[in-house]
Amino acid sequence: MTYKLTAVPAFRLPEDYRHMGEPSAWAKMTRPGQPMHSFLEAAFFDADGNLWLSDVPYGRIFKVSPEGDWSLAHQIDGEPHAMRIAPDGRHIAVDYRHGLIELVG
């Protein structure tokens, strides 16, 4: 059985958060010669219904509220990928440069 799905945008990165400066080394390696304002992945929801996303090339962690409001939750010198909230409440991420890290602050 085949299902036809239609993808529609659920959220859109606000213009203020689009990186317009020099591409990171990761962006240059992944998309040589092309602009890259973000590369969002690692989406998951916390217990309060917030959506968390990592922006790999620019070391940013975004939180999107259930109402669709974006905030920059963390900015690190790294390339964060997968993230989760640990059972004890700590925010844990896998980072290409630093390995397994805890996001604090």
Language model regions located:
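Sequence-structural signature of mature extracellular/luminal beta-sheet repeat domains
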Residues: 1-105
